[in-house]
Amino acid sequence: MSEAPKKRWYVVQAFSGFEGRVATSLREHIKLHNMEELFGEVMVPTEEVVEIRGGQRRKSERKFFPGYVLVQMVMNDASWHLVRSVPRVMGFIGGTSDRPAPISDKEVDAIMNRLQQVGDKPRPKTLFEPGEMVRVNDGPFADFNGVVEEVDYEKSRLKVSVSIFGRATPVELDFSQVEKA
């Protein structure tokens, strides 16, 4: 009795913006052709981010790898043709066009760890770092430039050193009140 070949992870390039649809179509094709034993997971790694638009907090999903779908599969002619036959799939990444290379276990572990770290707390869409130049776009300090001193992601606030009358003055602002300079 021979052991079943091991499923490896492959990166499939899809039309940008259609990653979710490609993943869904691929799952449907797998079921339709009774090839479940050759395939494992099909996923589009995402994280939840928070952005502030018009003073409103909005949650949205950001893809880790825009334009790519990760597929766990046993590579053979039948599975290769099935993936290639899915609409909006451009091909595999790595290796040659007819013999794709799987991504390493180390890379898979790094992706899985990143997905687990995302957890429940959505991240802000725009990330600020101390020392970064920002422009205040709202409030009494609108149109002033400043340097980020501290970032509080829990409260979505920044401490910015704004130059007022030639003196650096620390000002606490909301993420929505500043933009990158």
Swiss-Prot record:
Q: Which residues form a coiled coil?
A: none
Q: Which GO terms describe its biological process?
A: DNA-templated transcription termination; regulation of DNA-templated transcription elongation; transcription antitermination; transcription elongation-coupled chromatin remodeling
* Keyword Transcription regulation recorded: yes
- Keyword annotations from UniProtKB, A to Z: Transcription, Transcription antitermination, Transcription regulation, Transcription termination
* CC per GO annotation: cytosol
User: What region holds the KOW domain?
Assistant: 130-161
The protein's matches in InterPro entries, at most eight in alphabetical order, are given as:
KOW (IPR005824), NGN (IPR047050), NGN-like_dom (IPR006645), NGN_dom_sf (IPR036735), NusG-like (IPR043425), Rib_uL2_dom2 (IPR014722), Transcrpt_antiterm_NusG (IPR001062), Transcrpt_antiterm_NusG_bac_CS (IPR015869)
- SUPFAM superfamilies for this protein: N-utilization substance G protein NusG, N-terminal domain, Translation proteins SH3-like domain
Its biological purpose is as follows: Participates in transcription elongation, termination and antitermination. In the absence of Rho, increases the rate of transcription elongation by the RNA polymerase (RNAP), probably by partially suppressing pausing. In the presence of Rho, modulates most Rho-dependent termination events by interacting with the RNAP to render the complex more susceptible to the termination activity of Rho. May be required to overcome a kinetic limitation of Rho to function at certain terminators. Also involved in ribosomal RNA transcriptional antitermination.
Q: Please give the subunit comment from the record.
A: Monomer. Interacts with the transcription termination factor Rho and with RNA polymerase.
Return the similarity comment. Answer: Belongs to the NusG family.
Return the protein name: Transcription termination/antitermination protein NusG
